[in-house]
Regions:
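A detector for small-residue-rich transmembrane helices and their helix-helix packing motifs
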Residues: 2-201
C-alpha cells in the first residue's frame, strides 16, 4: 500500500478533514458565546458529580469554559488533534469524538469531588491525544508513529494533568479522557490495522 504522512489523497479530502474538524472544534466557541446570553447561560452547566438534577451537564461541559484563555487553549489543541484524527481515522472519526465527548463527563460524575462543577473540553482533548498516541504504539505504521511523535512533542506535558497536582484543574476529566482514549485505542487497534497494514522493512 502506498503511504503518505496523513493518508491524504487529494485536496478535496484535505479540505473535508479541515471542514469536519472545524465543525467539532467550533462547538465550544458557540458554547462560550451562549454563556454570555443571560436567558441561556443558566442552562449551560458543567458536570456536578452525583447530582441527578444536573446530570445533563455530562453532555454540555465540553462547551462551557471559564474564560477566553481557557477556551482558546482547549480549542487550539482540539483542532490540531481533530485534523490528525480525521486524516488518519476517517471511518471512526465521529465514533471516537463521541466517546471522548461523553465518557470523561461520566467518569467525573462518578468519581469527582462532590459540590464542585467541572467544565471545559480538556477531557475530549485528552481522549483524542492519548488515542492517537497509543495507536502509534500499537500499530507499526509510519503515519501513526509520526502522529504519536507529534502528540508527544506538542502535548508531552499532558501526562501530568491526570494527577491531582493543581486544585483549580479538573484532573478527573483529564484522567477520564486518558482512560477512555486508551480503551478505545485498544478496541479499535485491530480494525484500524486491517485498514492500514503494518509496513515491512
Amino acid at each position: 500500500m502506498e503511504d503518505n504522512l496523513f493518508h491524504i489523497v487529494d485536496k478535496k479530502t484535505f479540505l473535508q478533514a479541515l471542514l469536519e474538524a472545524t465543525f467539532v472544534a467550533i462547538l465550544p466557541i458557540w458554547g462560550y458565546i451562549l454563556q454570555h446570553i443571560p436567558t441561556i447561560n443558566e442552562y449551560l452547566i458543567g458536570v456536578v458529580p452525583r447530582d441527578w438534577n444536573h446530570i445533563y451537564g455530562i453532555l454540555l461541559f465540553p462547551i462551557v469554559h471559564h474564560d477566553l484563555s481557557h477556551l482558546l487553549g482547549n480549542v487550539l489543541a482540539l483542532y490540531i488533534l481533530l485534523i490528525l484524527l480525521k486524516n488518519s481515522f476517517s471511518p471512526y472519526f465521529y465514533r471516537i469524538v463521541l466517546c471522548g465527548w461523553i465518557f470523561p463527563g461520566i467518569f467525573i460524575w462518578l468519581v469527582g469531588n462532590s459540590n464542585t462543577m467541572h467544565i471545559g473540553a480538556s477531557g475530549l482533548v485528552y481522549h483524542l491525544a492519548f488515542f492517537i498516541f497509543w495507536i502509534g504504539i500499537m500499530i507499526r505504521q509510519r503515519t501513526f508513529i509520526a502522529q504519536s511523535l507529534i502528540v508527544i512533542f506538542l502535548y508531552g506535558g499532558f501526562f501530568w494533568g491526570i494527577f491531582p497536582l493543581f486544585p483549580e484543574v479538573s484532573w478527573e476529566g483529564h484522567l477520564g479522557g486518558f482512560i477512555s482514549g486508551t480503551i478505545q485505542a485498544l478496541i479499535l487497534s485491530k480494525p484500524i490495522s486491517k485498514l492500514y497494514p503494518k509496513e515491512e522493512n
